[in-house]
Amino acid sequence: MEGSDFLLAGVLFLFAAVAAVPLASRLGIGAVLGYLLAGIAIGPWGLGFISDVDEILHFSELGVVFLMFIIGLELNPSKLWQLRRSIFGVGAAQVLLSAALLAGLLMLTDFAWQAAVVGGIGLAMSSTAMALQLMREKGMNRSESGQLGFSVLLFQDLAVIPALALVPLLAGSADEHFDWMKIGIKVLAFVGMLIGGRYLLRPVFRFIAASGVREVFTAATLLLVLGSALFMDALGLSMALGTFIAGVLLAESEYRHELETAIDPFKGLLLGLFFISVGMSLNLGVLYTHLLWVVISVVVLVAVKILVLYLLARLYGVRSSERMQFAGVLSQGGEFAFVLFSTASSQRLFQGDQMALLLVTVTLSMMTTPLLMKLVDKWLSRQFNGPEEEDEKPWVNDDKPQVIVVGFGRFGQVIGRLLMANKMRITVLERDISAVNLMRKYGYKVYYGDATQVDLLRSAGAEAAESIVITCNEPEDTMKLVEICQQHFPHLHILARARGRVEAHELLQAGVTQFSRETFSSALELGRKTLVTLGMHPHQAQRAQLHFRRLDMRMLRELIPMHADTVQISRAREARRELEEIFQREMQQERRQLDGWDEFE
């Protein structure tokens, strides 16, 4: 691809994303499906703006690579060890059972048994990019089904290596004996990467961070991700697996959040490029000539994988309310099929249009997943948002709650329990199905679903409520919900949870003045108790706590328009000096008041 053509392709991709994704969100079909439809529109079977699909698809796999690095950062080795049973138990069972069933079905058609085995393995894999994206959108990350889904995807990445090695054996083109020297070198190189990463990465990043130049840190992060991907590719292993390991090695480092921030914009853009490329690769010619075969294949593929995944989830002990989410989000074919089927085609395992038919089936199955998950959400909404049983006595006796609480995790539960104890009429919106089921058993008015959907807010009584308390885990969800409430329900008093100072600044900029930083108050209280244990009188410690709170809030408001680190640091130093002066001025006055203060500790 020439330089000018590459630039034109980049402009087209950006235009497709900017046009398709907001339209898809407006239609309620999700960003992933919007990317896929945009790819079909600009690809060789649509308007024909871009024809070199294979090269772009290979480049766009970097989106998956960046995504796996961020996932690795969220796990540490001890947590990964805890998942070993689900990775090598459920993950292995899913691949083997799905591959066996799908290979058997392919053998009933014109596929030779060797081609059927390769086809079954390729179709058994799921799309890491799509599944993880949808799990994040649906709030499945911290749920039992989300953890199990990640374990299955991780095993599928590990299965890439033996699957690719199996192709030449099935084609009869493998060497009579293995080159044990070459295999040994690859194993040593892989072990060397693990050891080197374990002991060298932190000192290297510490040295880079000492320069104080953010751009250099970002460049080093990109070098780490791309370098580990290329290194694993040279060993014949999965690039995504390499970056995942690099992320795990840095999961417990002090640079974890900075690394995540540096990578996140690249991950989002490249993931969008990946989905657009998948849409471009859809061969509409094969779809037109073999329409019935393709439709039946897609239905059978999705049905077989859902059946296998649902049964495994049941055997593993996943709650019944989460099994369909787990099965649905992994029901599609994956990006690995493109690599495996291309390798098999080069070994002449496929005949005629067999490879094209399989790839069309995989692509269309990926397009069904967002729609399938919407159907699952609707089914769950009907199941959990229906009327209460006759023997239940809900806190809300009518459809006019005083308060809507969004999220009922550790933070939201404290607020909800306080309101319930004071007989306030509340409605809770929660995305964790098991929590919804439990709370409805106790008679609480709970709705399952995404609170950023205006229709759900209306159903929950937002038009009649006085206040809404937002306790979402993700800051993006919080800000989106604030915007929706301000636009559609301007009468609501908005109270929100902020995870830290950055989120507090964003809330203040959005006009939300009633918020609470989740660790600030508890940290202040513990600090007050620490002052008392060090000999300070309880009255003086209480005043110190109040002064600190007021000054910190004033700083927070003053620094809203300022985001430069140097300004923040400079103002923080001034505030510390100001706080010390306040305490010194009040020392004598505090001593006079000590006699009138009763110790309460």
From Swiss-Prot:
Domain RCK N-terminal intervals: 400-519
Xref: InterPro entries: Cation/H_exchanger_TM, K/H_exchanger, K_H_efflux_KefB, Na+/solute_symporter_sf, NAD(P)-bd_dom_sf, RCK_N
One Gene Ontology cellular component: plasma membrane
Localization per Swiss-Prot or TrEMBL: Cell inner membrane
Listed GO MF terms: glutathione-regulated potassium exporter activity
Keywords: Antiport, Cell inner membrane, Cell membrane, Ion transport, Membrane, Potassium, Potassium transport, Transmembrane, Transmembrane helix, Transport
Main subcellular location of this protein, as a coarse class: membrane
Bilayer topology: Multi-pass membrane protein
Keyword Cytoplasm among UniProt keywords: no
Transmembrane portions of the chain: 4-24, 29-49, 55-75, 87-107, 115-135, 152-172, 177-197, 207-227, 230-250, 268-288, 291-311, 324-344, 356-376
A GO BP entry: proton transmembrane transport
Coiled-coil regions listed: none
Recorded family membership: Belongs to the monovalent cation:proton antiporter 2 (CPA2) transporter (TC 2.A.37) family. KefB subfamily.
Subunit structure: Interacts with the regulatory subunit KefG.
Its biological purpose: Pore-forming subunit of a potassium efflux system that confers protection against electrophiles. Catalyzes K(+)/H(+) antiport.
PANTHER family xref list: K(+) EFFLUX ANTIPORTER 3, CHLOROPLASTIC
HAMAP family reported for this sequence: K_H_efflux_KefB
Stored NCBIfam families: 2a37, PRK03659.1
Protein name (Swiss-Prot/TrEMBL): Glutathione-regulated potassium-efflux system protein KefB
Upper lineage: Bacteria, Pseudomonadati, Pseudomonadota, Gammaproteobacteria, Enterobacterales
Gene: kefB
